[in-house]
């Protein structure tokens, strides 16, 4: 697949890049993408939830009232799960939600995600650019010129660029990162992917 390279003004530079078919034209494995995305989202969970059992709630655990003669159901402890202020049965406990996915499956998932975006025509290649200062307007103008101002966009740079990343931080629908850091979830969660030209080479080195 070939794509025309655009400048930051949104016009064609006359240059054409050829996308690597092993990465952007691969067979799409929905199952690999499912496993990787499920793992990414699960690994974000803190797992610090906690409910106290009857052994942990406050109180001495005395018998709340005598066994017979009150008309109430018998109770043996103020910490019983049946009492107000008592412990919780089978409540949530701290745990790790981490899910391991093999490296080959992760790479297959990323290739599948990029191939799906390429087939959908949601990949844009722009010439490499730099910003002189941290400022939102230049990045917003680039998105507008590319016709992506209203779309959830993933912008990939060859290396982490602090100035570009912080310039785009105030744009809610924009996510900026280096190409090698883009996960399957980042790719699938976007409506368009903007590659700086050098970022294509970077991702080919990572996934090739």
Curated annotation (Swiss-Prot):
The Swiss-Prot or TrEMBL record annotates one GO molecular function as: rRNA binding
Q: Which InterPro entries match?
A: Ribosomal_uL4, Ribosomal_uL4-like, Ribosomal_uL4_dom_sf
Q: Where is this region: Disordered?
A: 46-84
Q: Polar residues composition bias: which ranges? A: 69-80
Instruction: Name a single GO cellular component.
Output: ribosome
Give the GO biological process terms: translation
Disulfide partners: none
Q: Name the source's superkingdom.
A: Bacteria
- Pfam families, per the entry: Ribosomal_L4 (PF00573)
For this UniProt record, the keywords arranged alphabetically read as follows: Ribonucleoprotein, Ribosomal protein, RNA-binding, rRNA-binding
The cross-references to SUPFAM superfamilies, in alphabetical order and at most eight, read: Ribosomal protein L4 (SSF52166)
HAMAP family registered for this protein in UniProt: Ribosomal_uL4_B
- Function as written in the Swiss-Prot or TrEMBL entry: One of the primary rRNA binding proteins, this protein initially binds near the 5'-end of the 23S rRNA. It is important during the early stages of 50S assembly. It makes multiple contacts with different domains of the 23S rRNA in the assembled 50S subunit and ribosome. Forms part of the polypeptide exit tunnel.
Q: Which family does it belong to?
A: Belongs to the universal ribosomal protein uL4 family.
List the protein's name. Answer: Large ribosomal subunit protein uL4
């Amino acid at each position: 697949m070939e794509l025309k390279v655009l400048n930051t003004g949104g016009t064609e530079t006359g240059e054409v890049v050829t996308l690597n078919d092993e990465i952007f034209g691969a067979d799409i494995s929905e199952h690999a993408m499912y496993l990787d995305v499920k793992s990414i989202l699960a690994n974000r969970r803190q797992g610090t939830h906690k409910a106290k059992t009857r052994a942990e709630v406050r109180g001495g655990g005395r018998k709340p009232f005598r066994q017979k003669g009150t008309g109430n159901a018998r109770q043996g402890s103020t910490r019983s799960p049946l009492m107000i202020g008592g412990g919780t049965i089978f409540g949530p406990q701290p745990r790790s939600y981490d899910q391991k996915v093999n490296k080959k499956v992760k790479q297959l998932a990323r290739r599948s995600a990029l191939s799906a975006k390429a087939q959908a025509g949601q990949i844009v290649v722009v010439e490499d650019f730099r910003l002189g200062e941290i400022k939102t307007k230049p990045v917003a103008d680039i998105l507008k010129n590319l016709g992506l101002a209203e779309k959830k966009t993933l912008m990939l740079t060859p290396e982490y660029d602090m100035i570009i990343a912080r310039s785009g931080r105030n744009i809610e629908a924009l996510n900026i990162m280096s190409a090698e850091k883009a996960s399957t979830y980042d790719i699938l969660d976007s409506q368009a992917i903007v590659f700086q030209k050098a970022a294509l080479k970077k991702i080919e080195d990572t996934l090739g």
